[in-house]
Amino acid sequence: MGVEIETISPGDGRTFPKKGQTCVVHYTGMLQNGKKFDSSRDRNKPFKFRIGKQEVIKGFEEGAAQMSLGQRAKLTCTPDVAYGATGHPGVIPPNATLIFGVELLNLE
C-alpha cells in the first residue's frame, strides 16, 4: 500500500524537493490497464505543484519528493494514496491503482 517508485533513468542523486518548493514535472497518468487519463506531455506544458501543500494526490507528492532533479520514474499509487473509494467520476474508477510516468524537470 502506498507509492512504489521504479527509476527509469537516474537524476543527479543530490537535489531533492524540499517542503514548500515547487516541483516542475512532466507526467503521464494511467490506469492499471494502461488507459491514459492525463498527460502534461500531451499539453506540451510542464505541471507545477508545491511540496507539502496537498495540491496533488498523496502518492504523487510522496513519490516526487523522493526523486532527484532530472530523474525519470514510474510511480505506482495504490488507492489509499490516490483517489480511494470515491475515484474521480468519469475519469478514475473507485479503488483504482494509478501509474504515473514522472520526470522531475526543475525545482523553484
From Swiss-Prot:
Subcellular location: Cytoplasm; Sarcoplasmic reticulum
Key words, A-Z: Cytoplasm, Isomerase, Rotamase, Sarcoplasmic reticulum
Protein name, per record: Peptidyl-prolyl cis-trans isomerase FKBP1B
Pfam families the UniProt entry points to: FKBP_C
S-S pairs: none
Known EC number: 5.2.1.8
Family: Belongs to the FKBP-type PPIase family. FKBP1 subfamily.
Cited InterPro entries: FKBP-type_PPIase, PPIase_dom_sf, PPIase_FKBP_dom
Reaction catalysis annotation: [protein]-peptidylproline (omega=180) = [protein]-peptidylproline (omega=0)
GO molecular function terms noted in the UniProt entry: peptidyl-prolyl cis-trans isomerase activity
Domain (PPIase FKBP-type) ranges: 20-108
Quaternary state and interactors: Identified in a complex composed of RYR2, FKBP1B, PKA catalytic subunit, PRKAR2A, AKAP6, and the protein phosphatases PP2A and PP1. Interacts directly with RYR2.
Keyword Cell cycle carried by entry: no
